């Protein structure tokens, strides 16, 4: 303890005035069952308002000819709904006596005008809609690649992001690849793979179909299948429908 302070001079508390907002429940009649039902309805409207809320029970508006109120029962109902009774306001002798018996403070009747306090219903916020997914990036479109010389066996020619046009013959063992369509304006004896990145609308156009293999978006036919087609060796186009390659005459 500081030598400059003694138990008689060192203050351990202060009394201060304060304006606190206290909810007042003004009872109009002695009907605890109706009060319980109506409080439950109020709690359903705004449950956060009724959460350990300090309360003054105003009994000074009860008719004088009504019987004594069950004050402990009234406080239990209030406590059940989240209202904590701090004191009562009363003018009837029986109500004041009931409060004194349970050591509950009694305030004098109020002459001030009080406005009804209605808890605002809680607004339930609707969840924000999920943002729309961004559109898939547009495939990079490049100019058509044009090959004017014969394509020999073992060569591989790829048209990235576009179509491939070959104006000469394609030998066995040669391979043509394109992200788009393939056009061969000569004998097609090698392999032609169009739409290799999944473009199911790609097509293959051949002046003379004698290919080792044709493929669109991963669906293919090899030479053994193509030879059985009546259009073998003629001018055809190859398209994809579902997972079936269709060969039709040009």
From Swiss-Prot:
- Biological classification of the source: Bacteria, Pseudomonadati, Pseudomonadota, Gammaproteobacteria, Pseudomonadales
Protein species of origin: Pseudomonas putida (strain ATCC 47054 / DSM 6125 / CFBP 8728 / NCIMB 11950 / KT2440)
Gene this protein is translated from: minC
Looking at the keywords, is Isomerase present? no
Signal peptide positions are none
Q: What does this protein do?
A: Cell division inhibitor that blocks the formation of polar Z ring septums. Rapidly oscillates between the poles of the cell to destabilize FtsZ filaments that have formed before they mature into polar Z rings. Prevents FtsZ polymerization.
The biased composition feature labelled Basic and acidic residues covers 112-128
Key word Cell division present in the record?
A: yes
Name its GO BP terms in alphabetical order.
cell morphogenesis; division septum assembly; regulation of cell division; regulation of cell septum assembly
The domain of life is Bacteria
Protein name as catalogued: Probable septum site-determining protein MinC
UniProtKB keywords: Cell cycle, Cell division, Septation
